[in-house]
């Protein structure tokens, strides 16, 4: 079974990542050396726990954003995604032969909002991918 990490370890790791993200790596040994250089930590055991949790969080950050941790690079990436504008608008009728192809629910929504857009209702069927596991007999 796993061990419970204390609030001290989690808070220290979070602060380390927010302040020194570019210097940290996915390697425990380098994070341990960096932790001992940056912070004054009372014991070797606590330093190792903080470095280990920092390494764990760095690996999670590589996969995607981690709740509770925000650093400059992550904020810039989020800002870029928020400001994204597509090359061609989905509502641009010049690329779709003068009509929008939408499902029945969306057509009702467009009609209730009072837009005068020529629409073509298309039936949408749920596409089911291949099963991940074989059926049992």
Swiss-Prot record:
Taken from the record, one Pfam family name reads Ribosomal_S17e
Q: Which GO terms describe its biological process?
A: translation
Q: What is its main location?
A: cytoplasm
Look up the domain of life of the source.
Eukaryota
* Compartments, as annotated in UniProt: Cytoplasm
HAMAP family in alphabetical order: Ribosomal_eS17
| Function text | Component of the ribosome, a large ribonucleoprotein complex responsible for the synthesis of proteins in the cell. The small ribosomal subunit (SSU) binds messenger RNAs (mRNAs) and translates the encoded message by selecting cognate aminoacyl-transfer RNA (tRNA) molecules. The large subunit (LSU) contains the ribosomal catalytic site termed the peptidyl transferase center (PTC), which catalyzes the formation of peptide bonds, thereby polymerizing the amino acids delivered by tRNAs into a polypeptide chain.
Quaternary data:
Component of the small ribosomal subunit. Mature ribosomes consist of a small (40S) and a large (60S) subunit. The 40S subunit contains about 32 different proteins and 1 molecule of RNA (18S). The 60S subunit contains 45 different proteins and 3 molecules of RNA (25S, 5.8S and 5S).
Annotated protein name in UniProt: Small ribosomal subunit protein eS17
> Lineage from the top down?
Eukaryota, Fungi, Dikarya, Ascomycota, Saccharomycotina
Name the gene for this chain.
RPS17B
